[in-house]
Amino acid sequence: MKTPWKVLLGLLGAAALVTIITVPVVLLNKGTDDATADSRKTYTLTDYLKNTYRLKLYSLRWISDHEYLYKQENNILVFNAEYGNSSVFLENSTFDEFGHSINDYSISPDGQFILLEYNYVKQWRHSYTASYDIYDLNKRQLITEERIPNNTQWVTWSPVGHKLAYVWNNDIYVKIEPNLPSYRITWTGKEDIIYNGITDWVYEEEVFSAYSALWWSPNGTFLAYAQFNDTEVPLIEYSFYSDESLQYPKTVRVPYPKAGAVNPTVKFFVVNTDSLSSVTNATSIQITAPASMLIGDHYLCDVTWATQERISLQWLRRIQNYSVMDICDYDESSGRWNCLVARQHIEMSTTGWVGRFRPSEPHFTLDGNSFYKIISNEEGYRHICYFQIDKKDCTFITKGTWEVIGIEALTSDYLYYISNEYKGMPGGRNLYKIQLSDYTKVTCLSCELNPERCQYYSVSFSKEAKYYQLRCSGPGLPLYTLHSSVNDKGLRVLEDNSALDKMLQNVQMPSKKLDFIILNETKFWYQMILPPHFDKSKKYPLLLDVYAGPCSQKADTVFRLNWATYLASTENIIVASFDGRGSGYQGDKIMHAINRRLGTFEVEDQIEAARQFSKMGFVDNKRIAIWGWSYGGYVTSMVLGSGSGVFKCGIAVAPVSRWEYYDSVYTERYMGLPTPEDNLDHYRNSTVMSRAENFKQVEYLLIHGTADDNVHFQQSAQISKALVDVGVDFQAMWYTDEDHGIASSTAHQHIYTHMSHFIKQCFSLP
């Protein structure tokens, strides 16, 4: 992209006890600096809602170490990185023969079959059911024998060959050949009670961030799976109103463990799929949790195959400051799995919880005798440590006052990782490689490729890491490039969004400022979306866009076209975000500051940030607002209920209001248990309802979906009740049958239109 990005340097303002150091900031408003002479259109609310200006992605799926699949004009093409050419893998006309609208596809690892997904029906955040057909690529025809049942919950190819494992009605089945009958692996599945090979609600949302609980061994011989038992888990119930012709609303019931309630139990099994027989039932071998876990409630939180016959399991206590990794080997003579205590690796936290959200996954060397893992070092920063399976101690191979975000690939010579080391900016992401024979030899592969445009990268490696796709997300327009890891040479630009860049030349775009303030000798980063032709001598209304949950990050170098773009471009509102105590990727001291005390420091810091912004000279301190969604809705409500006098108004969407109402895994990670012996007092002292009286001083808009399975409508209902009880005049909006995302087309347009009207009224804008 050839956009003449500008750099804003200099001090925008000064504040008492605050140091402001300005870093390079990409300005998106191109052209004249004279607002009166700029006749270009602004980025409007309609532009956001209708997605007028679309960011182009480049999605690929690696199928070998040098080939990937991608879609173009609805054809599936295969690109050969070695020769630099593309060919048609499957024509769009082929899909027309199926008689169904194909939602997704998946190629078997041996390239012989393609799995076609249709009749997609969403369930929760990750889960869904669908129908599947298998297409034989050699015979160029659908397989009609022994088809996978409709309403299948999950399906996955083995890593090699073309075995299939799938879950239907909460039970697991395996196909050795796509056209042959399935082997049934489990017989205990029961809706909302026993889940085999798939997660229940809380494991899906808070532990695995996935619906699948199946793990193939690398050669496809063994299939590991988890079983979750929700028999004793309490149900959340809510009405689903559906079509207006429905005389009685449906009642949705979901096993949902709230803080302190009965949790699901978990068991883990492995089955040998090479020994399946149509005569006898499959034999699944259980691997039990370590004795240190069995003494109380615990979670299975990670499963990783080390070799064909070695598997690692990570277990976590319900109080999530203690985890154990078991490394288990297959004993062919007995058919059992042996997990030696001598190979257990314990991870603990004395200041908070283990991991960012859960313990990180291990990355094993080829022989399975050692692995690399991200853990906190003595200084409280998350870095890569090298473990040998028979030794307790590990060797850190990275260090510094920055953090490794993730390990991306491991070869015999190098380890590749993403970190935020570059220029000391926590909101940046770059790709590095470290030489395994000499840990002092570290190379940043992305830092200097296009530093003005690209400071936030993610990566996708080919099967053996010979090639990789770099995905730049900002601060400029997204850029996708292909590289060879042999010499780290850039091979080609896959997508540069040049068409969008040309369109945006004709739009008055806002600018983005990324900076930090120093409070109590600690850096806290913030970002500001500034109106076009920003003039620091003028006064602007300011909207604080907040999330502020544990390990969150709002101040980053990502390019976005969103609601804030409209507010800044068209309404001349500054939209700011601030990462205070509790935020992530800056060390445990900051992140663990809110351990066992949600609703305190992260709330206070948003108020203090607004105070400091108002001292910068260009903020109208009589027109400061705050808004947030989910945890951000909670913080917004706690801020407005603080009686600080800083904010005129605010919007809370789907907020938590009392932590005893939220799920056990998330809440207890940060708060412990709501018992007198543990942390009940703070549970009770951190509610929005206890601050109801102070809402008389502000304008408040409360929004929630009635079918929110995550943060239940109950949470907003209790806020509403408390405000009514003390006579607070406030606004409220509910969205019928909408879940936590309020994402249906009509609801999405309505909520952002409604919030825009509220903010404009609050700021006295026309």
Swiss-Prot record:
Name assigned to this protein: Dipeptidyl peptidase 4
Signal peptide (UniProt feature, chain positions): none
Organism the protein comes from: Homo sapiens
EC number(s) stated in the UniProt entry for this protein: 3.4.14.5
The record's account of how the chain is modified after translation: The soluble form (Dipeptidyl peptidase 4 soluble form also named SDPP) derives from the membrane form (Dipeptidyl peptidase 4 membrane form also named MDPP) by proteolytic processing.
Membrane-topology annotation of the record: Single-pass type II membrane protein
UniProt induction comment: Up-regulated by IL12/interleukin-12 on activated T-cells. IL12-activated cells expressed enhanced levels of DPP4 but not mRNAs. Down-regulated by TNF. Up-regulated in migratory endothelial cells and in the invasive endothelial cells in tumors. Induced by hypoxia.
This protein's encoding gene: DPP4
Subunit field text: Monomer. Homodimer. Heterodimer with Seprase (FAP). Requires homodimerization for optimal dipeptidyl peptidase activity and T-cell costimulation. Found in a membrane raft complex, at least composed of BCL10, CARD11, DPP4 and IKBKB. Associates with collagen. Interacts with PTPRC; the interaction is enhanced in an interleukin-12-dependent manner in activated lymphocytes. Interacts (via extracellular domain) with ADA; does not inhibit its dipeptidyl peptidase activity. Interacts with CAV1 (via the N-terminus); the interaction is direct.
Disulfide bonds: C328-C339, C385-C394, C444-C447, C454-C472, C649-C762
Active site (UniProt): S630 (charge relay system), D708 (charge relay system), H740 (charge relay system)
Coiled coil: none
